[in-house]
Amino acid sequence: AEDLGAGPASGSWWRGGSEPAAMLLVPCSMGTVGAIASGATRNLVHRAADVALKERLPLVMVTRESPLSAIHLRNLLSLREAGAVIMPFSPCFYLRPAGVEELLEQFCGRIFDQVGLTHGLARWAGQE
């Protein structure tokens, strides 16, 4: 995570494949949010997220902390305005998951939807 010369630190690396690239930060701490929002790329994760934003590639940040301070909210807004998708880990109980595994699968499906990955996981289909 400290090798700022690794492939993901370069926009060329992201554009090298035949498939569109995306970056998922799961889970994403408020420390990481703050570093990326401020442009302080202290490690490869921060730098790769910075590159994803500058290259206009999908960046999905699944945040895990609550409650949120005003500083957290400003940082999240800054990242959203820069193009990131902010997804607090808030599972949907309206699908009535039978257990934690179903709950996690459904949330993973929502993450996959954000980056255009095809999947067969449960989706909300409206009221029955």
Language-model features: locations:
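A cross-family phosphate/adenosyl-ligand binding-site feature
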Residues: 1-60, 64-128
